[in-house]
Every structure is written in structure tokens, then in C-alpha cells.
Design a protein with these regions (language model features):
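Short acidic loop-to-helix transition motifs that present clustered carboxylates
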Residues: 50-54, 144-146, 170
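A glycine-rich helix N-cap at a beta->alpha junction
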Residues: 152-175
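Metal-dependent catalytic neighborhoods of phosphoester/phosphodiester hydrolases
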Residues: 28, 147-148
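Acidic/His- and Gly-rich active-site-bordering loop/insert found
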Residues: 2-101
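Active-site metal-coordination/substrate-binding segment of hydrolases
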Residues: 63-134, 139, 144-145, 151-160
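Short, intrinsically disordered, charge-balanced linker/junction segments flanking boundaries
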Residues: 93-99, 163, 172-178
Length: 178
């Protein structure tokens, strides 16, 4: 798949995600959205008691013995608005403005932290042109002010490599097992 096509898919997934309100402590709808997304794509999916979503994609043929790679992104966002903007973060979607170069929001925060991480994971889960070992995407809740998902069941962390990125050009590598 070309870089342009991949970028189009990531941006499309992000813009769709922005339609789902997702402030911290109110992730039920976005959790449901991601669960249903996985089902539509024929992927194994689980939801835990905190509404964290765990999606598994099997390995490409011939790559079954490659260690699982786990990608993690949080689904909640900081919700702020400019003074005078009528915005209810629990119920209102983000109005994304795409000028062809930059994505911004109409008077509110955009939710790129970590909505773009979620969108990138969704792209990886749906791209069937990549050869890969087993992939797991973990979408966690309440990262912005509580880090509730630190209590994630350790059985979900059985990967050879865990990839998480919060900043451009900075990638965290870790493993549940040394």
C-alpha cells in the first residue's frame, strides 16, 4: 500500500473517531465504537471491566512463529473549548477542519492525543498488505487523569514487543517479559 493511501486511511479513521465523544471517565461510547469496529473487520475483540478494548489480528501465513507485537493507545482525550463555544464534551462530537494540510478543530481541542494513535492502530489492524506476526492493539481508558488501565490484566501483555508512542519521533519499546 502506498504511503498516501495509508495516510488517507489513518486520517479517515481519525475523523470518524472524532465523531465519538470521549472525555476521560466517559469512554463507554468510544469503547463500544472500537468493539464494533473490530467485529466489522472480523477480528477477535475483548472488553474488560474498565472498558479497555483488546483487539487481536492473527499472523500472516508463514509468520505464525514471530513474536506478537502489541500496540497501545488511549481512547480518552482532554476536552477544552474556546470561550463562548457551546460544547458539551460528553455528548458533542469534535468538528474537524481539514484544509488539506492541517487538521484542526472548530473551537475545541482536537483529540489527537491519542486519537491519532488509535487511528494508526486501526490502520495496522486492517491493512492486509503487510506481512506480520500476531498483532494486538490495546485501547485503554482514562489515561488523561487517572491511568486506571495500569490495572490491565497482565495476560493481555504477552507480546514479544510492546509499542507505544505519545510524541512524534519518540517511541517506547518494552516487553512484558524479559
Amino acid at each position: 500500500m502506498s504511503k498516501d493511501k495509508a495516510l488517507d486511511i489513518v486520517l479517515s479513521e481519525f475523523i470518524e473517531l472524532a465523531k465519538v465523544p470521549r472525555p476521560s471517565h466517559h469512554e463507554e461510547r468510544v469503547s463500544k465504537y472500537l468493539f464494533e469496529w473490530a467485529e466489522r473487520h472480523g477480528l477477535a475483540v475483548e472488553r474488560d471491566s474498565l472498558n479497555d478494548i483488546i483487539i487481536d489480528k492473527p499472523a500472516s501465513p508463514g509468520c505464525e512463529n514471530v513474536p506478537r507485537v502489541i500496540f497501545q493507545a488511549h481512547m480518552d482525550m482532554v476536552c477544552v473549548s474556546e470561550e463562548g463555544v457551546d460544547y458539551d464534551p460528553v455528548n458533542d462530537p469534535i468538528k474537524v477542519i481539514n484544509d488539506g494540510v492541517t487538521l484542526t478543530a472548530d473551537g475545541t481541542s482536537l483529540g489527537a492525543d491519542d486519537g491519532i494513535g488509535v487511528a494508526m492502530c486501526l490502520y495496522l489492524l486492517q491493512d492486509d498488505t503487510l506481512r506480520h506476526g500476531p498483532i494486538r492493539a490495546i485501547f485503554t481508558t482514562n489515561e488523561e487523569d487517572g491511568m486506571d488501565s495500569l490495572n490491565l490484566d497482565p495476560r493481555y501483555l504477552d507480546g514479544g514487543v510492546i509499542l507505544k508512542s505519545e510524541q512524534s519521533f519518540h517511541l517506547s519499546f518494552s516487553s512484558a517479559f524479559s
